[in-house]
Amino acid sequence: MKKLLIRETFDTFLLSEASITTFSTFQIDGHFHPEFLSTGEAELLTVENCGYALWRRIRPFFFELTKGKNTPLRFHIVFRLAPHNVEALLVRSGLTLSSGDVDGLFLNIHFDGSALTCTSGTSLRVFSLDKGLERAWDSMLEKFFHQKEIPFL
């Protein structure tokens, strides 16, 4: 939990959406609104130009909602892989899909009050029976978890 909420472990992922239930339920829409920033700040953006905020921007607010003596009743976080990383995965895996065919690669994190579950997901803009992208994404996530010393089954 510390690697998710306190450390920078997931900071390069984009946030699609999140919700957390403590004394109330809080919903977070991960869509990024660059018009909120000053011109100088907006010019420094790269990854977030794809329409979603980086987890590193939202993590402090999410963490603030978890602080206190009580554990959250539940939370759900949906991360998306940044488009340039999707492209890199496609190239590295030798898949025939183009980045335009991929709507998103997702990491769903669900906490039910006692256990944390991570599930991968893919969304394509085209129909395909090929499961190569799903296998490549799962493999990439396994390597990521291993590298970050996050236990998984």
Protein language model annotation of sequence segments:
Residues 10-13, 23-26, 32, 36, ...:
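Phenylalanine-focused residue identity feature
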Residues 1-57:
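Charge-rich, low-complexity N-terminal segments
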Residues 4, 13, 17, 58, ...:
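Generic alpha-helix detector with strongest preference for long hydrophobic helices that associate
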Residues 27, 32, 37-40, 45, ...:
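General N-terminal targeting signals
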Residues 49-115:
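Surface-exposed, low-hydrophobicity interaction/linker segments
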Residues 116-153:
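Mixed-charge, glycine-accented linear interaction segment located at domain edges/termini
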